[in-house]
């Protein structure tokens, strides 16, 4: 029990430091929990990576955070906060297509089907606009968009029948 309480105190301290703009202090506080693979530590680490607390190794910290978050949402697709942090992380890493998909999944996890479809359509438009495109991510977006549009049509049909 004491170790768990100490962990929470450390997390709260790091969160307060980050909120005050002391990213370096928050990173130092969180160092004692580096072996902890729990969701709260992972999310705080993602916040720190986004705040640039890693200094010169910032991109490496962001990539590690993206990997951890991607693993998390694959196992728990309803984790809105993890999807949102993943979207921000991909955006900061210069991966707008992946960021839009993660935004769409975050909207879906919140129950906002229209918002999810909107974000995925934005991803489709971006992919069709040319430039360096991640074809795998583009295919995932296309497939996911079809799934969500089918859900939307089913809900609309259900609504019409209930009138």
Tell me the role of every PLM-derived stretch.
Residues 1-31, 61:
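Extracytoplasmic and endomembrane cell-envelope/extracellular-matrix remodeling and assembly machinery
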Residues 1-4, 31-39, 70-77, 89-93, ...:
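Solenoid-like repeat scaffolds
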Residues 2-11, 36-44, 61-65, 78-82, ...:
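Generic helix N-cap/helix-start motif at coil->alpha-helix transitions
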Residues 13, 45-52, 86, 103, ...:
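Structural register within alpha-helical repeat arrays
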Residues 16, 48, 89, 106, ...:
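TPR/TPR-like alpha-solenoid repeats
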Residues 27-31, 62, 66-70, 103, ...:
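Inward-facing hydrophobic residues that define packing positions of alpha-helical scaffold repeats
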Residues 109-163:
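Terminal, low-structured helical/coil segments at or just beyond the last alpha-helical repeat
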């Amino acid at each position: 029990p004491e170790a768990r309480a100490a962990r929470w105190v450390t997390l709260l301290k790091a969160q307060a430091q980050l909120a005050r703009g002391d990213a370096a202090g928050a990173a130092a506080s969180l160092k004692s929990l580096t072996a902890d693979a729990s969701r709260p530590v992972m999310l705080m680490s993602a916040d720190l990576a986004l705040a640039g607390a890693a200094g010169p190794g910032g991109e490496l910290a962001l990539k590690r955070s993206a990997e951890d978050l991607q693993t998390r949402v694959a196992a728990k697709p309803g984790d809105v906060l993890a999807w949102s942090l993943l979207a921000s992380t991909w955006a900061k890493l210069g991966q707008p297509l992946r960021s839009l998909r993660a935004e769409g999944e975050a909207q879906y996890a919140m129950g906002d089907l229209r918002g999810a479809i909107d974000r995925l359509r934005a991803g489709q438009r971006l992919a069709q606009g040319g430039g360096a495109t991640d074809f795998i991510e583009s295919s995932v977006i296309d497939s996911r968009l079809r799934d969500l549009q089918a859900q939307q049509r089913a809900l609309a049909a259900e609504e019409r029948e209930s009138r």
